[in-house]
From Swiss-Prot:
Knocked-out gene: effects: Hermaphrodites produce fewer live progeny at 20 degrees Celsius than wild-type, and also laying more unfertilized oocytes throughout the egg-laying period. Abnormal gonad morphology. Delayed recovery from the developmentally arrested larval state known as dauer. Significantly longer lifespan. Decreased movement. RNAi-mediated knockdown causes an increase in daf-18 transcripts.
Entry GO CC: nucleus
Domain bHLH: 92-149
UniProt xrefs under Pfam families: HLH (PF00010)
Sample GO molecular function, one term: protein dimerization activity
UniProt superkingdom: Eukaryota
Stretches for region Helix-loop-helix motif: 106-149
Polar residues compositional bias, start-end: 1-23
UniProt keyword list: DNA-binding, Nucleus, Transcription, Transcription regulation
Basic motif as annotated region, ranges: 92-105
Protein name stated in the entry: Helix-loop-helix protein 25
Phylogenetic placement of the source organism: Eukaryota, Metazoa, Ecdysozoa, Nematoda, Chromadorea
Length: 268
């Protein structure tokens, strides 16, 4: 009889978590996200020496694209007071660390939610990308949008990023600023507004472009209603002659004796 090898829980625990396929996929996803965040950082940072966190990068990206300032929703006093304090016990330090991590995740979640709403509202990206908008997909769509639509960005954002967008030089940006804004042609500009008198007196046209029927002025007359009272029945009865046929009302003939009997009954 062959020997059956029974597996125990110790066999599964022998493999560390950082070597499992799930941890490898999470690590790969984290590295791609960090690369995209660094690319966003090169767009929104004011100088190369400026050191900003991922939350600040996302705040500036959201303000650059949508114009919404999410950073004002969070107060910076909470973290500064907690870092200045000296905690005696390890539990207090751990509590402050968890609170700081919650605030950091809340900031990132709000930024990604705002960018996701912007993508869905503008119908950006492909249909397959919009079905499952993960953080990597959101950052890829937003970076591509910034590079190809630098003219549509909000003017209140950082002006230093314009030379960095899509590899454009400062000369092209200056030439674009010197260009005159294109005016929108409307229908009313194609057809000038002319009055009827100007069209009639136009020397170039032999016949008027617009013709209107000449309606004479009818003077208002006052008439007495009572003087024409006799004509009113004839006015209303005349049309009825053509509509209703002439009807003869037939009444039964009564004899003189019956009439006398009726009068006697009334007298009695």
């Amino acid at each position: 009889m062959p020997k059956v090898i029974q597996s125990s829980m110790s066999d599964y625990r022998s493999v560390p978590y950082n070597q499992t396929p799930k941890s490898a996929s999470e690590r790969k996803r984290r590295n791609i996200t960090n690369e995209l965040i660094n690319e966003c950082k090169t767009i929104v940072q004011k100088s190369e020496e400026e050191h900003i966190s991922q939350e600040v990068v996302l705040f500036r990206i959201v303000k650059l694209v949508t114009g919404v300032n999410l950073e004002s929703n969070f107060s910076s006093n909470d973290l500064s007071e907690s870092t200045r304090r000296k905690f005696d016990t390890e539990s207090e330090r751990r509590k402050v660390k968890t609170e700081r991590e919650k605030i950091r995740r809340k900031k990132q979640d709000d930024c990604y939610a705002e960018l996701k709403f912007f993508i869905l509202n503008k119908q950006m990206g492909s249909y397959e990308q919009r079905l499952k908008l993960e953080r990597i997909t959101i950052l890829e769509i937003i970076i591509d949008y910034i590079k190809h639509n630098s003219d549509l960005l909000y003017p209140e954002t950082i002006p230093q990023i314009l030379p960095l967008l899509a590899g454009k030089s400062t000369a092209t940006c200056e030439n674009k600023e010197n260009e005159k804004p294109k005016t929108r042609m409307e229908v009313k500009d194609l057809f000038p507004r002319l009055t009827f008198q100007e069209v009639q007196e136009s020397p170039t046209s032999t016949s008027p472009l617009l013709t209107f029927p000449c309606i004479p002025m009818i003077p208002t007359t006052q008439f007495n209603v009572l003087s024409n009272y006799n004509t009113v029945p004839s006015i209303f009865s005349a049309p009825l002659r053509f509509i209703l046929p002439s009807l003869q009302i037939l009444t039964p003939e009564t004899s003189d004796e019956e009439e006398n009997e009726e009068t006697l009954d009334i007298i009695n």
